[in-house]
Amino acid sequence: MRNIFTLLLSIIFTSVVTSQDVNDNIRFIPQSQVPQHVLDRQETLFPTNFVSEWRVQEMDGMQDAPNLRYIAKFEDDGRPGFSASYLPSGVLIFNSEFMPSEIIPAEVRLKIDRDYKDYTIRHADFITFYNPKREIYMVKLLKDIGVQYVFYNTAGNEIPKDSLPLEIKI
């Protein structure tokens, strides 16, 4: 009986471990592997912020420089939840800020309440893109056990997923 229980437990554990969703295109890296252009730009744009981690993202699975993005996760005045994404040359692609549901602007919250009546707003990320300049709220919604992300501009208009910048789709 004990052997059967152990075997059953190991099968369950193995299936849980092997079924985890892993993004092989993003990995943690030490600051020493971040290009100096990226480090300098981060220091210039966010001089008082503490970078807690660096990640590198390989676009399309390619590891050559034009296909890499460097992502800094940092704190602003002790508040975590900020990130910035850079090209290897130091060009800022976008930065984002975590927002609890309570501080999402009223025009966005009201539209979500109207469009997604059965959902609860969990939080949002306020994302600023720089080429071309766009500001987007990526809002996480919950319904029972389901999760859905919706996207709104600063005027409170929903953005169709097919018109989002490529960087947000990856």
Pin down the residues of each PLM region.
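Bacterial Sec-dependent N-terminal signal peptides
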Residues: 1-25
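Sec-dependent signal peptide cleavage junction
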Residues: 18-48, 160, 164-170
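Outer-membrane beta-barrel domain signature
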Residues: 28-29, 61, 99
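Sec/Tat-exported extracytoplasmic proteins
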Residues: 45-50, 116-119
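Exposed beta-strand-loop-beta-strand "reactive/processing" segments of non-cytosolic proteins
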Residues: 50-84, 129-151
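A short, surface-exposed beta-strand/turn
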Residues: 80-94, 148-163
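Long, charged/polar, surface-exposed segments that mediate recognition or autoinhibition
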Residues: 83-122
